[in-house]
Amino acid sequence: LVDNSVSSGAQIKTGGKTPAGTGAFYPATVLTVKSDNPILKQEIFGPVAPIVITSSDQEAIELANATEFGLISYVYSADLKRAIKVAESLESGMVAINKGVISDPAAPFGGFKQSGLGREGGFAGIEEFLETKYIGVEI
């Protein structure tokens, strides 16, 4: 994944090589990439963060939404109001603002598009196991 991205023009800022020896894990890797890099069309499960510099929030939103995946998105900003506006525009099942870990047993977990249908956890996750009944009464 990283090698393919680098061969398509990405630059490794940190990580990118597995340390020698046994028991080594792939290190956290940060890449700077152009908006046409194939890594942006992948659903990445691992410590790899491709970073794209954009000129506007709208450009960043369009680029993020251009993928067929949508499990989680991350927004970092000193302007919380702006970050929430961006988060609301992202086609993603979960959005973390200014944090890396978003898991919470009380919150729904799941994605949009090819990243899943339905939710686990929270009220949304238990709802599909409930029998909903409507009773209409006229008195």
Model regions: which residues?
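Short secondary-structure junctions
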Residues: 9-17
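Conserved C-terminal structural/oligomerization subdomain of aldehyde/semialdehyde dehydrogenase
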Residues: 18, 25-139
